[in-house]
Amino acid sequence: MAQYHQQHEMKQTMAETQYVTAPPPMGYPVMMKDSPQTVQPPHEGQSKGSGGFLRGCLAAMCCCCVLDCVF
């Protein structure tokens, strides 16, 4: 009977403890509760139809042709 009371008390104290986590690595962005939310500017990328994919394919084909002629 004494063993039952010891196990019951141990389970109760384990449930009441707070869990602690490790701090994030250095340089990792951390959001503070008191700091205001920062608004990031919109991403300025290339517009559609700029031909990036087509230019890359043509450059690859030219490289293949040059390598074919050389070897």
UniProtKB/Swiss-Prot annotation:
Spell out the GO cellular component terms annotated for this protein, sorted alphabetically and separated by semicolons.
cytoplasm; mitochondrion; plasma membrane
Region Disordered, annotated ranges: 30-49
Q: What is its main location?
A: membrane
Protein keywords? Cell membrane, Cytoplasm, Membrane, Mitochondrion, Transmembrane, Transmembrane helix
Question: What factors induce this protein?
Answer: Induced by salt, cold and drought.
Subcellular location field: Cell membrane; Cytoplasm; Mitochondrion
Lineage top rank: taxon: Eukaryota
**Gene Ontology biological process terms, A to Z:** negative regulation of response to salt stress; regulation of reactive oxygen species biosynthetic process; response to salt stress; sodium ion homeostasis
Q: Name one Pfam family in it.
A: CYSTM
Consequence of gene disruption: Increased tolerance to high salinity with reduced reactive oxygen species (ROS) levels and associated with an over-activation of nuclear salt stress-responsive genes.
Signal peptide residues are none
* UniProt entry tagged with the keyword Transmembrane helix: yes
Note the coiled coil stretches, chain numbering.
none
Tissue expression: Mostly expressed in leaves and flowers and, to a lower extent, in stems, siliques, shoots and roots.
Regarding the membrane, this protein is recorded as: Single-pass membrane protein
> Which chain regions cross the lipid bilayer?
48-64
The family assignment reads:
Belongs to the CYSTM1 family.
Q: How does it assemble?
A: Heterodimers. Interacts with CYSTM7 and WIH1/CYSTM13.
The function of this protein is: Negatively regulates salt stress responses and Na(+) homeostasis. Prevents Na(+) efflux, disturbs reactive oxygen species (ROS) homeostasis, and represses the expression of nuclear salt stress-responsive genes. Involved in resistance to abiotic stress.
- Protein name, UniProt field: Protein CYSTEINE-RICH TRANSMEMBRANE MODULE 3
